[in-house]
Amino acid sequence: MIYKVLFQADKTQSPLREATKSLYLEANSAVEARQLVEDNTPYNIEFVQELTGEHLAYEQESEDFKLTEF
C-alpha cells in the first residue's frame, strides 16, 4: 500500500500548517509507514494517510509524487 506522510522537518519547533511537507512511501500498514519515517528521519510526523483508488490516482498526477525509499 502507498501512504502519504505529513510532517514538520524539525521536531524542536512548534508545528505550522504552512511548513507542513509530505512524502510518499510503500509499506504494509500505517504503523509500519510511521516507524520507517521515525527510524530514518528527524521529522515530526503529523499524519499518515493510506492512499487508494481515485485519491491515489490524483496524488500520482502531481509532479511532487515520488516514492521515498529508506
Swiss-Prot record:
EC code(s) of this entry: 2.7.7.6
Protein's UniProt keywords contain Transferase: yes
Catalytic activity: RNA(n) + a ribonucleoside 5'-triphosphate = RNA(n+1) + diphosphate
Listed GO CC annotations: DNA-directed RNA polymerase complex
Molecular function terms from GO: DNA binding; DNA-directed RNA polymerase activity
InterPro entries: RpoY
Keyword NAD: no
Swiss-Prot/TrEMBL GO biological process terms: DNA-templated transcription
Keywords of this entry: DNA-directed RNA polymerase, Nucleotidyltransferase, Transcription, Transferase
HAMAP family according to UniProt: RNApol_bact_RpoY
Similarity annotation: Belongs to the RNA polymerase subunit epsilon family.
Subunit relationships: RNAP is composed of a core of 2 alpha, a beta and a beta' subunit. The core is associated with a delta subunit, and at least one of epsilon or omega. When a sigma factor is associated with the core the holoenzyme is formed, which can initiate transcription.
Function description: A non-essential component of RNA polymerase (RNAP).
Protein name in UniProt: DNA-directed RNA polymerase subunit epsilon
Species the sequence originates in: Latilactobacillus sakei subsp. sakei (strain 23K) (Lactobacillus sakei subsp. sakei)
